[in-house]
Amino acid sequence: MLHTEIYGLNNKHTIASFFAGVGGIELGFEQTNDFKAVYANEVDKNAQITYQTNFPEINLDIRDIKEVEATEVPKVDIVTGGFPCQAFSIAGYRKGFEDERGDLFFELLRVIKENRPKVIFIENVKNMVTHDKGNTFKVIRESLVANGYYIKWKVLNGKDYGNIPQNRERIYVVGFNNKETYDAFEFPEPVEMTTELSDIIDYNSQEDEKYYYREGKQPFYDKIEEAVISYDTVYQWRRQYVRENKSGVVPTLTANMGTGGHNVPLVYTKNGVRKLTPRETFNAQGYPEEYKLPELANSHLYKQAGNSVVVPVIKRIAENISDVLSKHDVDDAMNIQDANYALVYTDLQGNYAGESYTHDYYNSYEEAEAALDQIDDRFPLIHDTEYMELVRKRKSMKFYSIVQL
């Protein structure tokens, strides 16, 4: 099957979403009323149920992305991807590209190279920036810019940028296929958090008894009873002890918070100590009340919430993307040449933000090196070991690198 041309559906920018999960990224984009998801890919069977419950009109492709031909994906304006975070996160044991799930980025890149969307959007765990001494993100960054994308990235916390009481830091990568929109785009500014825990957690309701911790029900109940004593805070059972989150927000939700009694957020309520309900964990990610949770085991719903995104942060970034597309939507993508090397400019702003793009393409390393002498002597040419040292020391620097294609 060949591409379906569906640019600008009903004057809205179209989206193809990969590793779609339960649809948090497209939900945030669609809340702006400027975007419409027309294709999504998700292989997890339980996530598929939740996705289709809430997005019945979207063509959900349930195959493994490795089985999807790039030519089968509709031609869209934006390709989004939140490839499995376990391959990069501390919680996923720091496996990185040694884990086969890390290879899924290259499957996403395969689709991007074929479809050439105007915008790419990636969300992942904060640790992706520093994983493997910085090499993991270096590969991702260089792969995107070598294929003609001008990218900016920044680590944002949901409580600071989404007005959501959850401590959730994630890296957001936005890429454009032309420099004009890239230059105009900025990440949103921080906002005051006015949403309180009581807005997402019902401390007065009587929930199903299965959510409560009772004497004789859990072998560690005495530790919980002693530690969990205050309203308006969230605790976390950490296998052997209780950790109190004193910042007035929910600790970072994880995919395993519903299994094994570990990483479970706990609250002190009118009716006793209990864990958050699945609905409350989705609330903590900024999902609206009308978002439907299907009849699935709670363990699946907890996993889906823990793997998902902070919807209001996605929406705020999407608003800025929409703004630059409306003002600078020009079709002058970089001409990707049949060359062997790319001369790449990077502005590394510590480990938490930056931007990068390809200056030009060359047939040999020597040509790229000679070109740098002609175009810019302010910023040095650095090599992999020097880059790793910058990441290790969390330093900021503007520099060039030569990437073999």
Where are each of the predicted segments found?
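Core alpha/beta nucleotide-donor-binding catalytic domains of modification enzymes
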Residues: 2-119, 126-130, 135-138
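Short acidic, glycine/proline-rich loop/turn micro-motifs
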Residues: 90-94, 264-267, 298, 355-356
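Short aromatic-glycine-(Arg/Gly/Cys) micro-motifs in beta-strand/loop hairpins
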Residues: 335-357
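Short, mixed-charge low-complexity intrinsically disordered segments
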Residues: 373-405
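C-terminal target-recognition/interaction regions appended to catalytic cores
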Residues: 216-333
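A short, exposed loop/beta-hairpin motif centered on an aromatic-Gly-Thr core
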Residues: 352-369
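Class I S-adenosyl-L-methionine
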Residues: 30, 48-52, 68-76, 86-252, ...
